[in-house]
Amino acid sequence: DQPRSRGLGDVYKRQVRIHGKKDSKVKVFLISMDDKNTKILESTYAKLEENAQVKVYEYRLGGREVIANTKADLLGDKSDLEIESIYFAYDEDQLDIQYDMDHYGKESLSDLKINGAMKDRAFKKLSSTLDFKVGSSKSDGSEEENVILLSDEAKSLSVPVLLSGEDDVAGNHAASCGKLDEESIFYIMSRGLTRSEAESLVINSRFIGPIDQLDDETHKEKIWNKVKEIMG
C-alpha cells in the first residue's frame, strides 16, 4: 500500500503483486472501504506458474471514484485462478473496473464472479477480457457479473471481450443487471419484514459468500456494518 496524498480529497493508491509458484496455493483478500472524499487507484497483477492455485477476494465499499485494474497471466499448464468480487456503489460514486485474464498454459482455468449493488446516482463501468493465447489449448475461462439496481438513476455498463488464438478452448461471459424482483420482495415482506429489511436480505444473500471466506471476524463485522450503512 502507498500513503494517501492530500489535495482535493484524499487519493489512495494500492499496488498488489501475486506470484503463484509451481504447485502453490494462494489466497488474497483485498478490502476497500473509504470515505466519500477518497479517490481510489488500484492495480493488481497475478502471475501463475504450473499447477498454481490462486484465489482472490475483493470487497469494494466506498470511495467517490474508484479506478481498478486487475491483470492475470496464467503462464503454467493447469494453473487455476478464481476471483470473487463484491461492490456497493451509492450517492455519486464512480467505478471504473477492468479485468484482463490472459491464458498461456495448457488446461489453465480462470473464473471471475462479481456481485454488485448500486443505488442513488452511482455509475459503474466494468470491462473484462478473456484472451486465450496460442498454446493455451484445452483451457477454460468464465466471467459472470450480477448487478442489482436500487434506483432509476444508478447506471451500470458492462463491456466483455473474448479473444482466442486456439480452437479447443471454452470462454464464457454472463451478465445480469436489473431491479429487485417485486414478487420476491412481496413474499419476504409477507413474512413480517419491512421493504427496507427485505431489500437488505436480498443484497446480503449476494454478498455473503465472499464475506464468509474471511477468517478475521473483525473485518467481517466492518464489512457487514458498511453494507448496512449504505443500505440506510
Language-model features: locations:
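Acidic, glycine-rich loop-and-beta core segments that form the ion-binding/anion-interacting portion
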Residues: 35-103
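Family-specific signature for flavin-dependent thymidylate synthase
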Residues: 103-232
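Beta-strand-rich extracellular passenger or scaffold domains
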Residues: 6, 26-30, 54-58, 83-84, ...
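Residues on the solvent-exposed faces and adjacent turns
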Residues: 20-22, 30, 48-50, 74-76, ...
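Single conserved hydrophobic/aromatic residue that forms the stacking wall/gate
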Residues: 1-12
